[in-house]
């Protein structure tokens, strides 16, 4: 008897109802109580039949327990789970609690990229009593706002081609991770604004060349662009490419904040024939960059590699990027600098907040030092060995406003890079689908049907506008503090103003 009643229990009621309606509509049509050509009734019959068959499938499949227990009805759970991020982003999250970037942070980039009003009435929405609230102190006698954008000269005594860099540049994002149109827009915007574009470890592509903007060539452990068939470093290929006048600096990637110690991954879905040809890798297969370099393995060898790249490139600035991990390892690099007399022209500190590379959850959340801790450590070590003046320090990691830049300068940076900030200027909506090749705005995809949504001419202007507005805001902050340059800024943090 219980088995006979099973179809009428609440968890099976959707399946039972679907089949009851299916037979009812079939009977009505068969007995000619309605016209056999009644389209709405026919559609209703087929809809109920589909749901009934779907329910049978749910009962016999073995992958999802919840579907076996609640046939048909459980699909509603999967639907709600699928649209949950969009519902949260558009309807439920506040202006300040969205992650990785809040609505306020995203909006300021959109507004500045479009040259729209970026002011806000009625005061701050931040909790000024919250533990760790930060601010910069202004002056009773503000300075004049600098008419010239802030720049920094990168290149030590042994550098023959020092580079005058903007203090705000595009951080490392590879062609392959980003679409061709995104690379075109970023690099052309960099050309218009006079700032640099880091290639990411994917290397220098034809789309970087099209824009004509200044290039920082990032050299990862995969050595893309100067790679031997066995995956090793090819000095001849590097020398032939590095003399390109568009390439202004060479950056050795030791690790990245999104996944330090894990290496790089470009999903096979994004490895098109074009990318495979540029990088020298198999088409359609995951492109894996080793977690460590093969051209060197010790701090002394790293210094030797820096000297070698500087010579092969004709004396261009050469440095390295890393996310700080074991402090003693970086101290070992500093010791090697002193012993060999070979110093990098720059060091880029990548905070673990970095996020344009897809990463395992544990690495994204818990591996590597955050930007501020890493930046302060590198600054102190360079000061300790007397090298801070000759080795410039760049930084990257969730830098999205001029205040973020001022904080970085206060902690020892000479310039800042931003990746996701410039992605927002291209139209990124933080859909968190970068690794799926299904980016809805055409920024992080190799699907030509999707990337065509990104109109290069329009987004080029927005990239330029965002950079220009950021530097202007930084100049205003610097002037309000009564300073001539943001590297004199001081950051203040208090547990509570009432303490």
Positions of predicted regions on the chain:
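Transmembrane alpha-helices and immediately adjacent membrane-cytoplasm interface residues
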Residues: 49-62, 81
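Glycine-rich phosphate/ribose-binding loops and adjacent secondary-structure elements
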Residues: 288-451
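An N-cap/entry alpha-helix motif that binds or orients negatively charged groups
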Residues: 74-155
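Active-site-facing alpha/beta catalytic cores
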Residues: 147-149, 153-336, 343
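Conserved small/polar residues in nucleotide/adenosyl-binding loops
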Residues: 492-499
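Juxtamembrane interface helix immediately N-terminal to a transmembrane segment
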Residues: 2-18
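Active-site or pore-adjacent capping/gating segments
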Residues: 427-490
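Hydrophobic alpha-helical transmembrane segments
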Residues: 35-47
């Amino acid at each position: 008897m219980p088995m006979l009643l099973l179809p009428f229990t609440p968890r099976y009621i959707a399946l039972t109802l679907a089949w009851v309606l299916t037979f009812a509509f079939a009977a009505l049509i068969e007995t000619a109580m309605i016209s056999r050509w009644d389209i709405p009734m026919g559609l209703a019959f087929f809809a109920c039949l589909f749901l009934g068959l779907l329910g049978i499938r749910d009962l016999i499949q073995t992958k999802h327990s919840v579907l076996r227990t609640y046939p048909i009805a459980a699909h509603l759970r999967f639907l709600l789970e699928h649209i949950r991020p969009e519902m949260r982003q558009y309807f439920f999250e506040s202006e300040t609690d969205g992650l990785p970037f809040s609505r306020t942070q995203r909006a300021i980039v959109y507004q500045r990229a479009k040259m729209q009003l970026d002011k806000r009435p009625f005061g701050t929405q931040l909790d000024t009593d919250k533990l760790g609230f930060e601010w910069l102190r202004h002056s009773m006698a503000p300075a004049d706002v600098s008419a010239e954008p802030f720049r920094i000269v990168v290149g030590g005594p042994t550098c023959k081609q020092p580079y005058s860099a903007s203090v705000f540049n595009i951080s490392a994002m590879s062609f392959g991770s980003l679409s061709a149109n995104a690379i075109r827009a970023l690099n052309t915007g960099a050309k218009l604004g006079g700032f640099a574009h880091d290639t990411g470890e994917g290397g220098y592509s034809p789309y970087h060349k099209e824009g004509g903007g200044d290039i920082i060539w990032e050299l990862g452990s995969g050595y893309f662009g100067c790679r031997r068939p066995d995956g090793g470093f090819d000095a001849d290929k590097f020398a032939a490419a590095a003399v390109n006048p568009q390439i202004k600096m060479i950056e050795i990637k030791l690790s990245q904040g999104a996944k330090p110690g894990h290496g790089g991954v470009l999903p096979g879905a994004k490895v098109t024939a074009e990318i495979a040809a540029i990088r020298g890798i198999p088409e359609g297969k995951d492109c894996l960059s080793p977690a460590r370099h093969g051209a060197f393995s010790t701090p002394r060898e790293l210094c030797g590699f820096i000297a070698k790249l500087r010579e092969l490139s004709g004396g261009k600035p050469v440095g390295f990027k890393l996310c700080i991990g074991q402090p003693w390892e970086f101290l070992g690099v500093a010791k090697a600098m002193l012993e060999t007399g070979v110093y990098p022209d720059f060091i880029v500190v990548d905070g673990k907040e970095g996020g344009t590379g897809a990463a395992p959850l544990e690495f994204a959340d818990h591996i590597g030092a955050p930007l501020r801790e890493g930046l302060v450590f590198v600054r102190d070590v360079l000061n300790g060995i007397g090298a801070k003046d000759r080795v410039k320090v760049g930084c990257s990691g969730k830098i999205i406003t001029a205040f973020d830049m001022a904080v970085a300068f206060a902690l020892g940076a000479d310039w800042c890079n931003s990746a996701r900030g410039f992605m927002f200027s291209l139209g990124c909506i933080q859909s968190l689908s970068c690794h799926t090749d299904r980016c809805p705005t055409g920024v992080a995809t190799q699907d030509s049907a999707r990337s065509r949504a990104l109109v290069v001419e329009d987004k080029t202007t927005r990239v330029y506008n965002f950079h220009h507005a950021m530097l202007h805001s930084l100049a205003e902050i610097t002037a309000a503090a009564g300073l001539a340059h943001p590297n004199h800024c001081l950051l203040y943090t208090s547990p509570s103003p009432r303490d």
